[in-house]
A protein has these predicted regions:
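PLP-dependent amino-acid enzyme catalytic core
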Residues: 1-135
Length: 136
């Protein structure tokens, strides 16, 4: 299982669910992975995939204490019918550059991408069990 440590105290280690529940580490640091996992897919295979398909694959790789069904439920709940664009994050070509439009959420700000999924991750069935285990 991937563990997360505080940026200010490497001795403070949590599971993904524990880090999500706690939010900010005891010493006011952020939780980051102790090691970056090897992605279980080839990045080239993500070409042409939807935002939700990519989100499920990437989040599943980093939050391995959630089941595949929990990740799917969280991503679908967070990103279905909540953005102006069905693509969630449209990519627009401007000259030779490809630009991600991160302003199609409820507040028209990039934070909608991360914060839309947070309540779903907090209330996923497994996280309730993780919360109880970590408090005991």
């Amino acid at each position: 299982m991937i563990k997360y440590q505080s940026t200010r105290d490497s001795g403070e280690v949590k599971s993904a669910a524990g880090a999500i529940i706690q939010g900010i580490a005891e010493g006011k640091g952020l939780f980051v992975p102790c090691e970056i996992p090897k992605l279980p897919f080839d990045v080239e295979d993500m070409k042409g995939k939807s935002y939700k398909e990519i989100a499920k694959a990437v989040i599943g790789a980093f939050f391995d204490d959630y089941s595949g069904e929990e990740i799917k439920s969280c991503v679908d709940g967070a990103y279905t019918d909540k953005f102006e664009s069905e693509d969630v994050v449209p990519v627009v070509k401007v000259g030779k550059a490809n630009i991600l439009e991160l302003y199609h959420g409820r507040t028209a700000a990039f934070k909608d991408m991360a914060l839309s999924i947070l309540p779903y991750l907090l209330t996923a069935p497994k996280i309730g069990r993780a919360s109880c285990r970590e408090r005991v």
